[in-house]
């Protein structure tokens, strides 16, 4: 016979939610830092094509 699980307390729920949010904040900060590095051109770990646009004025 199936027995219902006990309800998770509010404190445990809030703790798990806070851990999840803090991990997401860390990942977002890391992504922002990486984007700044790539845009500044100081990144050594990525290779990407630089497209130069030439303006033709006649």
Curated annotation (Swiss-Prot):
Disulfide bonds: none annotated. The keyword Ribosomal protein applies. It comes from Chaetosphaeridium globosum. SUPFAM superfamilies: Zn-binding ribosomal proteins. It comes from the Eukaryota. Keywords: Chloroplast, Plastid, Ribonucleoprotein, Ribosomal protein. The keyword Ribonucleoprotein applies. InterPro entries: Ribosomal_bL32, Ribosomal_bL32_plant/cyanobact, Ribosomal_zn-bd. GO terms for cellular component: chloroplast; large ribosomal subunit. This is Large ribosomal subunit protein bL32c. It is found in: Plastid, Chloroplast. GO terms for biological process: translation. GO terms for molecular function: structural constituent of ribosome. Belongs to the bacterial ribosomal protein bL32 family. Signal peptide: none annotated.
